[in-house]
Amino acid sequence: MNTYVLTAIAVLASLIILLVGRNAIKSSKKKPFQKHLLVFFGSGGHTGEMLNLLNALDDKLYSVRSYVAGSDDTMSVSKASLLSNSLPSVKSKIFKVPRARYVKQSWLTTPFTAFWSLLGSISVIFWNPFGIPDVILCNGPGTCVFICLLGYLAKFLGKNVKIVYVESFARVKSLSLSGKILMPFVDRFLVQWPDLATKYKRAEYIGIVA
């Protein structure tokens, strides 16, 4: 994972300048009181945790949503579709992005898949038909790192994006690599075990959401 993160950091600034620019910061077609929420489904148990979190959200406030999943993650796409159909008052769209790294993938080829994942993430954040999201809600490994870092960069382009990262239920005593990377960049870092909140100052204990 370190390899593709370093690759992302190396090309991120130039990609934003060349492919996005300040013209990407535009008003979306949503009412002033509506918030555009971007949700990343990290597959498997991560998706289950995210669905539980979404059940607690106010549909009226977060009535514009972008659901993002890996391009090969049919389960998460199916779950997102079911959620979208169950909330007719919510305007939503499902996006698929390439995975940053596949299970058991060689580290030698990871920079290449990571690069395509980064490009897909740029499209979801900066060329989204709903506009740049107001809130990004992420959990899970891999691609969510790009999503959150791009949201952080959007702040320097004039968009006040709030980024919330939820650490996995499986992380009881220590943070995941994604969590360690993202902690300095997110607005809220939520954990499901009290020991993590004690160990890391920025971590907020919210209880079990799995």
Swiss-Prot record:
Q: Name one GO cellular component term.
A: UDP-N-acetylglucosamine transferase complex
Any stretches that span the bilayer, and where are they?
Answer: 4-21
Q: What is its main location?
A: endoplasmic reticulum
Pull the Lumenal topological domain ranges from the record.
1-3
Membrane topology classification: Single-pass membrane protein
Q: Which residues lie on this side of the membrane: Cytoplasmic?
A: 22-210
Write out the GO MF terms. protein-membrane adaptor activity
One Pfam entry for this protein is: Alg14
GO biological process: one example = dolichol-linked oligosaccharide biosynthetic process
Subcellular location per the Swiss-Prot or TrEMBL entry: Endoplasmic reticulum membrane; Nucleus membrane
The family assignment reads: Belongs to the ALG14 family.
Protein function: Involved in protein N-glycosylation. Essential for the second step of the dolichol-linked oligosaccharide pathway. Anchors the catalytic subunit alg13 to the ER.
Quaternary structure per UniProt? Heterodimer with alg13 to form a functional enzyme.
| Descriptive protein name | UDP-N-acetylglucosamine transferase subunit alg14
Question: What organism does this protein naturally occur in?
Answer: Schizosaccharomyces pombe (strain 972 / ATCC 24843) (Fission yeast)
> What gene, per UniProt, encodes this protein?
alg14
